[in-house]
Amino acid sequence: MKHYLLAAPLLALALPLPASAKTLTVAAGPDAQTRLQEALILAEPGDEVVLGAGRFVLIDGISLDVDRVTVRGAGMDTTVLDFTGQRDAGEGFRVTSDGVTLRDFAVENPKGDGIKSKGADDIVYHRIRVTWTNGPAATNGAYGIYPVESTGVLIDAVTVSGASDAGIYVGQSRAITVRNSVAEANVAGIEIENSRDALVERNFVTRNTGGILVFDLPGLPVMGGGNVLVRDNLVVANTTPNFAPPGNIVAGVRRGTGILVMANDGVWVEHNTLYDNPTAPIMVVAYTQGFDDARYNPYPRNVTIGANRVDRGGTDPQLDGAAQLLAAFGGALPPVLWDGLAQPGATALRVEPGLAGWSLNLTEQGKGLGEANPGPLNVPTPDRTAMLTGVGAPAALEARLHP
């Protein structure tokens, strides 16, 4: 027995100890492509890849598939990953691992998406900038910040401009926070698509075609979007002409749309400031096209428009019969537009008393606006007992903002 007792601590000493986290530093300059990708490959869980100040000229996309790695630059205006000469058409930076933190650097002019994270749970984007420096163009990449198929997404203090689909896009994901960010001169500023438990707050969304979009679309592996809270955002002057490539779903977004909710269940929109969104400050609609996916519900359900501050909206609607509509409503359309479509037996929309609205009074989903019969909005008031719960990224992600 004594021999066994002595052997146990000796055996423990012989076992390999976990390696301590290390820092891999990469400077800008010659061979940055090779040195940066090598660091991302050699990184181990818990490591930090530190990017120095300067411009990293990259000709191919880079990727990370190691869990719990932090990639940190010297600042979104100081460390720049420059993909202007990118040879392939993929994303600039691709992440496929869990627990990753991306912070304090910029991505410029990728041929495809800026940063795409797929199946990457508990990811943090902090003080990241993605820019297409030539301004709005259909040839720009589709998405700036693009997490998809993930649980636990925190996007904080990022800036995106020039995306030909959405600046900040979160798709087929759960437990999401998008906050304190700037989305400017994209087709859609912020888009939450086929996702649940999302919090979109304190963002500045301006000069896009449409400001904040909450969509649910058919034909995707994950559907049933909802439980989304959109609050305390500044949604201003979303007046950029639509520059999405033909065929994209956002190519149908009308210039001058502030907040658009389509085919979601349980969306609460309140305490936002909407100014100079000339088609509609707030729009709630069913899916606009035909579909053959039996799993899909095309109608908005349980959407609540609470108290929002709205000014100078609906003054130049990009809608058929705009002149007649403006005349009927005294020169500007009311702040809330509903297409009038609802799932039988369900409440599509509730609106705060005193916030005027109007309905297209459509009678059939997917048939366009030809049968519209506009009239005043007549819907119930908000039910405060049904306030949303369980929205936002996990609290554990917050600690990674302040290491």
Question: Over which residues does each language-model region extend?
Answer:
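Sec/Tat signal peptide C-region and signal peptidase I cleavage site
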Residues: 17-21
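Short, T/G/N/S-enriched strand-turn elements that build extracellular solenoid repeat scaffolds
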Residues: 36-42, 57-66, 71, 116-119, ...
